[in-house]
């Protein structure tokens, strides 16, 4: 007999061989990617140490409380400024914009006061009314502490800024005094006045303050809006929680209904697409036919050239003919895909239905996203607190405040305690050593930017690890369901808890490695976004083009890595191998079933999109009618609101996040069942000695023809 020729080796590896001992996720495992696990633990310890150092050096009061020119906090308990909670600027005209004010970079004396001025006044007026004690008593509260009944000349007082040269009616915002701007008939006013006296007694128009207070009016209006939004939340939070609970119930019901309606939803959509494209073909033909004989309609697109008005092209028969041909091609492609891929589409729909059935047997998986949410919330909180403490780790830096054109020492660093003994006060009359910002010269302060970048990177790593842990845990639970020969009798007890234990005990290193790769790509994308922001004003077109290409490439790379990591975690949950081996096995398995992968991915994406739209839309519509009091039986129950969109928007966002949490479990379930299904087809042939583990529904859809062909190959 002639020797049988060996089958050519597949470039994507050999199919899985039948193993009578294989019953799903293996129990005997060993720790994988130990080195990465050790690095991960060391990084976490270092991250904790960084947080401790930031906690020691940081002082959030620098953000909570405004700081005066002496580096003292306004409103801090136990200090002389305890009752002085607001920061006032002596000469607001020196401030370029509200952003400068908020960032404490305005080159004028800043003083903590108990209240903002409520009238116009100048130091010259005070001197003119020096015999009126009530006038001085009001004005002196805005002077430096201890400055009472001055003997200095007016020039010296204003030069040394012992008192403000003028005060302006102001309102507190962000614990700072801002001019009380308003508009009347389109005219800018302050306290209903359009003119005021400046510090030297000259009349000036209120518009002179515009550069220092541009946008202040909008900011003050935003404060009012913010208070109203807070009131709306206070009166509607109970109903918001009820709406979110309804969203959770609707999401659960949708997942249950998918077992029976997945195919209906998909085929309705396909028929709808075919119908819409068919209508487009008919409409293009109608437009093409109606333009017959119209003067100029027979010109070609080449004849009229490039036109900025697109409507010109719609008056040509050639345009509608091109549209009609294009739509015909699309229609033919869709129909051919349905003809040749119909069986794979049916398998995809059956897997979706099987996913709903699996979740029904392991209901605890629906609540696992809560654990992922808690882990991510902890990561976000720790990152935010660490970032704030690092940002406030600086020591107070004081600089000389003087006229730059007359004083060469302006803006240099100074020490308040010794400033009056230096030559600066003699060479630059009126110069002051005032607080500028927070900084430092130590190693820690010099590398705060590096530490902030490390904070961001480790944050990304931990968040991705939390997501990876959830995916691996869910994959192990759903794999236990699939490889149970008799469902649900053979499903192991507590499959979710067992899978979680295996992932933590054996595969922390593998999950850390996968999340590290993804975190690196995401970190690079953040840097590219920062560079793109910096280059927006640049005229270098080549640099913008290169940056755009890099952003596109890394976006695609991130999507690919997320996809591969997801499938690698499934293989880790089943076989317990290291990350690289699992990723390779998953990739080869997917490539051996590439058409099924594409079909299942699109069908799943579509149905989950429908689910999110259905849950968010249905709950959102219900919330809209309730909060706008358009439900007659609940009119009296609806709270009185300033803005109904406040709770409505909260309900919409919350409903979407809840639906996303439920459907992420469903998507992981379908992906896991799909990989198990592909392996089932490779391992077994449906015979009594090698029976399939798939459900009877999948077995029936697979068809006798494919089963028999597999038996022949075996």
Swiss-Prot record:
<feature type="transmembrane region" description="Helical">
    <location>
        <begin position="238"/>
        <end position="258"/>
    </location>
</feature>
<dbReference type="Pfam" id="PF04515">
    <property type="entry name" value="Choline_transpo"/>
</dbReference>
<dbReference type="GO" id="GO:0015297">
    <property type="term" value="F:antiporter activity"/>
</dbReference>
<dbReference type="GO" id="GO:0015871">
    <property type="term" value="P:choline transport"/>
</dbReference>
<keyword id="KW-0813">Transport</keyword>
<keyword id="KW-1133">Transmembrane helix</keyword>
<feature type="topological domain" description="Extracellular">
    <location>
        <begin position="477"/>
        <end position="510"/>
    </location>
</feature>
<feature type="transmembrane region" description="Helical">
    <location>
        <begin position="370"/>
        <end position="390"/>
    </location>
</feature>
<feature type="topological domain" description="Cytoplasmic">
    <location>
        <begin position="1"/>
        <end position="33"/>
    </location>
</feature>
<keyword id="KW-1003">Cell membrane</keyword>
<feature type="topological domain" description="Cytoplasmic">
    <location>
        <begin position="532"/>
        <end position="605"/>
    </location>
</feature>
<keyword id="KW-0325">Glycoprotein</keyword>
<feature type="glycosylation site" description="N-linked (GlcNAc...) asparagine">
    <location>
        <position position="132"/>
    </location>
</feature>
<feature type="topological domain" description="Extracellular">
    <location>
        <begin position="283"/>
        <end position="320"/>
    </location>
</feature>
<feature type="glycosylation site" description="N-linked (GlcNAc...) asparagine">
    <location>
        <position position="192"/>
    </location>
</feature>
<feature type="topological domain" description="Cytoplasmic">
    <location>
        <begin position="342"/>
        <end position="346"/>
    </location>
</feature>
<feature type="transmembrane region" description="Helical">
    <location>
        <begin position="321"/>
        <end position="341"/>
    </location>
</feature>
<keyword id="KW-0812">Transmembrane</keyword>
<feature type="transmembrane region" description="Helical">
    <location>
        <begin position="347"/>
        <end position="367"/>
    </location>
</feature>
<protein>
    <recommendedName>
        <fullName>Choline transporter-like protein 5</fullName>
    </recommendedName>
</protein>
<dbReference type="GO" id="GO:0005886">
    <property type="term" value="C:plasma membrane"/>
</dbReference>
<feature type="topological domain" description="Extracellular">
    <location>
        <begin position="368"/>
        <end position="369"/>
    </location>
</feature>
<feature type="topological domain" description="Cytoplasmic">
    <location>
        <begin position="666"/>
        <end position="711"/>
    </location>
</feature>
<dbReference type="InterPro" id="IPR007603">
    <property type="entry name" value="Choline_transptr-like"/>
</dbReference>
<dbReference type="GO" id="GO:0015220">
    <property type="term" value="F:choline transmembrane transporter activity"/>
</dbReference>
<feature type="transmembrane region" description="Helical">
    <location>
        <begin position="606"/>
        <end position="626"/>
    </location>
</feature>
<comment type="function">
    <text>Choline/H+ antiporter.</text>
</comment>
<feature type="topological domain" description="Cytoplasmic">
    <location>
        <begin position="259"/>
        <end position="261"/>
    </location>
</feature>
<feature type="topological domain" description="Extracellular">
    <location>
        <begin position="627"/>
        <end position="644"/>
    </location>
</feature>
<keyword id="KW-0472">Membrane</keyword>
<feature type="glycosylation site" description="N-linked (GlcNAc...) asparagine">
    <location>
        <position position="205"/>
    </location>
</feature>
<feature type="topological domain" description="Cytoplasmic">
    <location>
        <begin position="391"/>
        <end position="455"/>
    </location>
</feature>
<feature type="transmembrane region" description="Helical">
    <location>
        <begin position="456"/>
        <end position="476"/>
    </location>
</feature>
<feature type="topological domain" description="Extracellular">
    <location>
        <begin position="55"/>
        <end position="237"/>
    </location>
</feature>
<comment type="similarity">
    <text>Belongs to the CTL (choline transporter-like) family.</text>
</comment>
<feature type="transmembrane region" description="Helical">
    <location>
        <begin position="34"/>
        <end position="54"/>
    </location>
</feature>
<feature type="transmembrane region" description="Helical">
    <location>
        <begin position="511"/>
        <end position="531"/>
    </location>
</feature>
<feature type="transmembrane region" description="Helical">
    <location>
        <begin position="645"/>
        <end position="665"/>
    </location>
</feature>
<feature type="transmembrane region" description="Helical">
    <location>
        <begin position="262"/>
        <end position="282"/>
    </location>
</feature>
<feature type="glycosylation site" description="N-linked (GlcNAc...) asparagine">
    <location>
        <position position="83"/>
    </location>
</feature>
<keyword id="KW-0050">Antiport</keyword>
């Amino acid at each position: 007999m002639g020797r049988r020729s060996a089958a050519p080796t597949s470039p994507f590896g050999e199919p899985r061989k039948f193993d009578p001992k294989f019953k799903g996720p293996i129990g005997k495992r060993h720790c994988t990617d130990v080195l990465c696990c050790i690095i991960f633990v060391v990084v976490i310890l270092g991250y904790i140490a960084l947080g401790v150092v930031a906690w020691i050096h940081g002082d959030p009061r620098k953000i909570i409380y405004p700081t005066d020119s002496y580096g003292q906090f306004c409103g801090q308990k136990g200090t002389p400024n305890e009752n002085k909670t607001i920061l006032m600027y002596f000469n607001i005209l020196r401030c370029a914009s509200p952003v400068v004010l908020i960032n404490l970079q305005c080159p004028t004396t800043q003083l903590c006061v108990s209240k903002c001025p409520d009238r116009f006044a100048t130091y010259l007026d005070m001197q003119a009314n020096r015999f009126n004690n009530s006038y001085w008593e009001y004005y002196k509260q805005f002077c430096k502490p201890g400055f009472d009944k001055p003997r200095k000349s007016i020039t010296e007082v204003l030069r040394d800024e012992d008192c403000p040269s003028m005060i302006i009616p102001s309102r507190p915002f962000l614990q700072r005094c801002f001019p009380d701007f308003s508009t009347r008939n389109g005219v800018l006013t302050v306290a209903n006045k359009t003119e005021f006296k400046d510090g030297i007694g000259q009349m000036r128009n209120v518009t002179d303050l515009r550069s220092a207070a541009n946008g202040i009016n909008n900011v003050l209006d935003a404060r009012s809006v913010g208070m109203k939004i807070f009131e709306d939340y206070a009166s509607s939070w109970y109903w918001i929680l009820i709406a979110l609970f309804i969203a959770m119930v609707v999401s659960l019901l949708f997942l249950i209904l998918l077992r029976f309606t997945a195919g209906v939803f998909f085929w309705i959509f396909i028929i709808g697409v075919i119908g819409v494209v068919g209508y487009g073909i008919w409409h293009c033909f109608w437009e093409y036919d109606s333009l017959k004989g119209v003067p100029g309609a027979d010109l070609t697109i080449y004849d009229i050239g490039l036109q900025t008005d697109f409507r010109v092209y719609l008056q040509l028969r050639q345009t509608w003919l091109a549209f009609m041909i294009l739509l015909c091609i699309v229609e033919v492609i869709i129909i051919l895909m349905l003809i040749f891929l119909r069986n794979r589409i049916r398998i995809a729909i059956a897997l979706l239905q099987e996913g709903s059935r699996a979740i029904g047997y392991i209901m605890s998986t629906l609540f696992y996203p809560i654990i992922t949410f808690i882990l991510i919330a902890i990561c976000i909180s720790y990152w935010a607190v660490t970032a704030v403490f690092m940002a406030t780790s600086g020591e107070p830096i004081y600089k000389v405040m003087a006229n730059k054109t007359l004083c060469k020492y302006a803006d240099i660093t100074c020490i308040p305690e010794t400033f009056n003994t230096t030559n600066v006060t003699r060479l630059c009359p009126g110069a002051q050593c005032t607080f500028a910002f927070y900084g430092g010269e130590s190693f820690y302060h010099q590398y705060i930017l590096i530490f902030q970048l490390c904070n961001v990177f480790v944050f990304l790593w931990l968040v991705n690890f939390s997501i990876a842990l959830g995916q691996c845990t869910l994959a192990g639970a759903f794999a236990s369901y699939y490889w149970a020969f008799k469902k649900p009798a053979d499903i192991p007890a507590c499959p979710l808890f067992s899978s979680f234990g295996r992932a933590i005990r054996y595969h922390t290193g593998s999950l850390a490695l996968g999340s590290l790769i993804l975190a690196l790509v995401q970190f690079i994308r953040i840097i590219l976004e920062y560079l793109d922001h910096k280059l927006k004003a640049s005229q270098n077109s080549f640099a913008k083009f290169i940056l755009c290409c890099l952003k596109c490439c890394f976006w695609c790379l991130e999507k690919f890595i997320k996809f591969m990591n997801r499938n690698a975690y499934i293989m880790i949950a089943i076989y317990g191998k290291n990350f690289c081996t699992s990723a390779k096995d998953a990739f080869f398995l997917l490539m051996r079933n590439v058409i099924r992968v594409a079909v299942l991915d699109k069908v799943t994406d579509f149905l989950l999109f429908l689910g999110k739209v259905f849950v968010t839309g249905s709950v959102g519509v219900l919330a809209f009618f309730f909060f706008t009091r358009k439900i007659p039986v609940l009119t009296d129950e609806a709270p009185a609101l300033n803005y109904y969109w406040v709770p409505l928007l909260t309900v919409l966002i919350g409903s979407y996040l809840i639906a996303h949490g439920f459907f992420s479990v469903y998507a992981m379930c379908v992906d896991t069942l799909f990989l198990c299904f592909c392996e089932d087809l490779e391992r077994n042939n449906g015979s009594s000695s090698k029976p399939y583990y798939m459900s009877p529904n999948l077995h029936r859809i697979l068809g006798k023809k494919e089963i028999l062909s597999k038996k022949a190959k075996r």
